[in-house]
Amino acid sequence: MNKANSFNKEELIACGHGKLFGPNSPRLPVDNMLMIDRIITINDNGGEFGKGEIVAELDIKPELWFFDCHFITDPVMPGCLGLDAMWQLVGFYLGWEGAEGKGRALGVGEVKFTGQVLPGAKKVTYKLNIKRTIHRKLVMGIADAILEVDGRQIYSATDLKVGVFSDTSTF
C-alpha cells in the first residue's frame, strides 16, 4: 500500500485504474470526471478534528470541458463538480487508509456556494478535515470541506459521507 503524503496527477490516474492502493481499493474517476490534479498533503492526524486532512488542487484552464457547455456565453464550473471532488477525496482517503471495496457518496449535511469558478481563474484548492472514519462491517468516512478559488473560499460542505462497499449490486 502507498502511504505517501502527497500524490501527483499520474498517481491519481493510477488510483482510478486500481494501480495505486491495489485492485480492490476505492477508485477515483478518470478523464473528465477526475476533478483533482494533485494532492498536496494527506495525513491521518492533522486537520481541525485531529483525525486527518487533505489539501488538493485543480488547475483551471479556459479549455476545461465544462466551460464549453455550462453555460453558452456564461461559462462557469458547475458547483456539483466541486462537491463531487470533495466526495472523491473522502473516498481516496479511505483507500489511502487501506479500505477495500467500491466507494460511493452517501450524503452531505449542508452545502453553501458563495462564489463561482470562472475560466479566468488559475487554481481551485480543496481543503478537507476528516471528522471520523469507521472500519468495521461498515466502512465510511465523514469530513467537512471548503473549496477556494485563487485563495478565496467560495464553497463549504459539512458532513460529507462516503462509504466503501464490497458489493454494490443491491445498492
From Swiss-Prot:
Keyword flag Cell cycle: no
GO BP annotations, alphabetical order: unsaturated fatty acid biosynthetic process
Predominant subcellular localization, coarse grouping: cytoplasm
Active site: residue positions: H70
Alphabetical list of Pfam families matching this protein: FabA (PF07977)
InterPro entries given in the database record: FabA (IPR010083), FabA_FabZ (IPR013114), HotDog_dom_sf (IPR029069)
Domain of life: Bacteria
Disulfide bonds: none
Subunit structure and binding partners: Homodimer.
Function: Necessary for the introduction of cis unsaturation into fatty acids. Catalyzes the dehydration of (3R)-3-hydroxydecanoyl-ACP to E-(2)-decenoyl-ACP and then its isomerization to Z-(3)-decenoyl-ACP. Can catalyze the dehydratase reaction for beta-hydroxyacyl-ACPs with saturated chain lengths up to 16:0, being most active on intermediate chain length.
Protein name: 3-hydroxydecanoyl-[acyl-carrier-protein] dehydratase
Lineage per the UniProt record: Bacteria, Pseudomonadati, Pseudomonadota, Gammaproteobacteria, Alteromonadales
Gene: fabA
